[in-house]
Every structure is written in structure tokens, then in C-alpha cells.
């Protein structure tokens, strides 16, 4: 595992631990306050925070286990646990949204008495806690992995839930109109639904070993052929991501170089600096490529008839 990855994982672990402690404390506070005040918005927010605590715990454990070194049975290590945790958390958030909307519809047609003052006080406290947790998870300039982003989405959902509870409490205190409580619960749920669905698709794509969405494979192939003179064709490209690490295997049809290892290093350096691909296994070929995916920047066969296999 790269040193930068280790430092990133340690930073993520500290962020998640702080957010977990704060979220758990306010989850208990909101649950008690929601029960005493009769507020669905507060109970919904407490339910969110309960799942947030679970989500942050899952994310924290995923980071912890992902730091284990590779072994003969898990040659890539346990980095994919962070992606799996993100998928579970996104799926759980979708389920929570459905349950809250269901309860809100029921509460709208069967109104309950809501105590506005305790609801407002607890909602403000919850909002401050969620703002702090969201800041903790997002501070710093380094890119956050999908696991931390999934946990942050849970916190964001609670942050919006606290805002909704505050607005509902103010409306109830000033007008006595209690249907605002379930209405805002549904509104907050809808706001979260899109982000949760997008994160679910992204984590599922990564679990299926799909290529990172921001990388255009055809552009990458052309870039290598254009910027490295000896490279005439790139084919049999496979690109995927494990945790925060991008990996690639490819075949490169090249002009027989004077220094094989130097050319290999130039290809790998280009992939690292331009596409952040930290582990690339390159097989160089010195003869004509005749397979269907050899159509990009195809050149006439280079001199020489032998094939050299090189794996990092």
C-alpha cells in the first residue's frame, strides 16, 4: 500500500471517529426530545442519526480493516471493504427515506400534538452537531474516498433534517399548524433521495470493477500514442479501482526501444501523473497487432518478430 494511501486512511479514520462520537451523542438526545415533544421531524432526524451512527461505525471499521496488508488469499488487501461499506450505507439511506415518507403520509392524515419549544431547542443543537460533523468529514484538500463521502451524505441528510425540524418548530409555535412537521420530513427525504441513489450506483459500479467514470479509455489510448513516440498502439486495456487505488493492465505495441525498462517507466509515469493510475502492468509487443481492439493509432508492423512480456 502506498504511503499516501496510508496517510489518507489514517486521516479518514480520525474524521470518522470524531463524527461517530458526536453523532451518537446527539442521536440519543434527539430521540429523547422527539419522544417527549411528539415531533415526527425530531424522531425522523433521530432515526437518521441512528443510521448515521451505524453508517459511521461501518465506515470506520471498513477503514480499519482496509489497512490490513495483502496476503496470499487477498492479494489486493482489503481496500474494497470501503466500497462495500459505501454501498451498504447508501442502500440503508434509501430504505430510511422510504420509511420516513411512509410514516409522514400516515402522520399527515392522523395528526399528533407537537411541542414546538423543545422541538426547536433540540433541532438547533442537532443542526450545530451536524454542521460540525459535516465539516470534519470534508475539511482538507485531499480527495475523499467513496466510503467517507457515503458517511458524509448520511450526515448531510441529518443536517437537512435538523433544518426541517427547526422550520417546523417555528411554524408550529407561531401558527399551531402541525401538518408542517410531516410535510417537511417528506421534503428533506426527497432532497436526500437523489444523492443516495447516485452514491449507490457509483459504489455498485466500483464493486463490479468498472472503470473510474472520469477516465475516457479511448482518450487515454490516444494520449499514450501521441505523447510517447515509441508507442504505436494501445489495446487490451483493463482499468478498475480498489478503494482509492486505480489499477490497469494494457498491451502496448511499440517500436523496439533501445532501453526497454526506460520506456516502460515512461508509460507508467505518464499514467500516474495524468490519470492517477498508481499500479499499471504493461505488456509490450514488437509485432503487428491483429485483434479487433487494435484500431486506434495503428501503425505498420515494427521490425522484429518476438514478443516481450513484462509484468510489474
Swiss-Prot record:
Transmembrane helix recorded as keyword? yes
**What transmembrane ranges does the database entry give?**
16-36, 40-60, 81-101, 117-137, 153-173, 177-197
| InterPro entries with a match to the protein in the record | Cation_efflux (IPR002524), Cation_efflux_CTD_sf (IPR036837), Cation_efflux_TMD_sf (IPR027469), CDF/SLC30A (IPR050681), Zn_transptr_ZitB (IPR023500)
Pfam families named in the record: Cation_efflux
Keywords annotated in UniProt: Cell inner membrane, Cell membrane, Ion transport, Membrane, Transmembrane, Transmembrane helix, Transport, Zinc, Zinc transport
SUPFAM superfamilies for the chain: Cation efflux protein cytoplasmic domain-like, Cation efflux protein transmembrane domain-like
Under Gene3D superfamilies, the record lists:
Cation efflux protein transmembrane domain
Q: Which family does it belong to?
A: Belongs to the cation diffusion facilitator (CDF) transporter (TC 2.A.4) family. SLC30A subfamily.
User: What protein am I looking at?
Assistant: Zinc transporter ZitB
User: Gene behind this chain?
Assistant: zitB
